[in-house]
Amino acid sequence: MKGNGSTLLNASQQAPGVGEGGGPRPSWLASTLAFILIFTIVVDILGNLLVILSVYRNKKLRNAGNIFVVSLAIADLVVAIYPYPLVLTSIFNNGWNLGYLHCQISAFLMGLSVIGSIFNITGIAINRYCYICHSLKYDRLYSNKNSLCYVFLIWVLTLVAIMPNLQTGTLQYDPRIYSCTFTQSVSSAYTIAVVVFHFIVPMIIVIFCYLRIWILVLQVRRRVKPDSKPRLKPQDFRNFVTMFVVFVLFAICWAPLNFIGLIVASDPATMAPRIPEWLFVASYYMAYFNSCLNAIIYGLLNQNFRQEYKRILVSLFTAKMCFVDSSNDPADKIKCKPAPLIANNNLIKVDSV
């Protein structure tokens, strides 16, 4: 424990104004990183609270699939409430002065958030796969009770996955990014295991699920005759695309950092110094930025979320209660039932985020 504490103190002493190769860091760098982080924190908190409130208020959004969406929003909120503000403090102070305990808690919660996000995105992909490709079994597999159990299992697995970080000494302060985080160069074997099991394997599962969905949707569209009534509603397709975009942006934002981890783990002593500091910093803050994107995606691509966002914001400005069920709105009285699509299992339905 003392050894880790001294490592933290030594690292924090290296932070002020020192850049790659021991030279001075650009004066604008800290300001730019602070701006990115402030924007991320504000949009993360406001956006994900809107997501949670929207699902709570609107019966059309209160379904088994959106239980995973709320869980993902909670994972994104975790970093905005505690770790990111501490990183911001470190930027303003040009080093970490909050002590060893806060460093460990911050790094732990950051890892909890990212692994929780990956596992929830995987859960969402499996949910969409079952909904579309195995629609006859979906209601039995994804009752509200079962979905809550799946989300609980996701967070249990997340805790199990993150706990070894507390024992391996990999949670340390890195002055390059002003953050207490997972240190890739401490253990090659452990870093490779983290990247493989916490990123690559979940991504393979997600890619498989969405690839199967795309294939099935294309097959269904080709089977529909020109003179027949289309069975795949545009809104249904947009709802699926919404969650696909969430996955793609997550992969884009987190892939560079994970690939850097694999490169460093191959030979820490040789490869770590060869990673350009600008690339390392950019990959980290691109990953940080991802936590504020999901709520924006829902608002842009999903009509139900977009309408509920507007209602919540209007209710705030008109001093109405945000927690009132909005499903009694006249515009929502038209019930939308998912259209069955002839495909695998003879039925295919695409509905909800």
UniProtKB/Swiss-Prot annotation:
Residues 54-66, 127-147, 212-243, 299-353 are cytoplasmic. Keywords: Cell membrane, Disulfide bond, G-protein coupled receptor, Glycoprotein, Membrane, Receptor, Transducer, Transmembrane, Transmembrane helix. Residues 1-23 are annotated as: Disordered. GO terms for cellular component: plasma membrane. Pfam families: 7tm_1 (PF00001). Belongs to the G-protein coupled receptor 1 family. This is Melatonin receptor type 1A. The gene is MTNR1A.
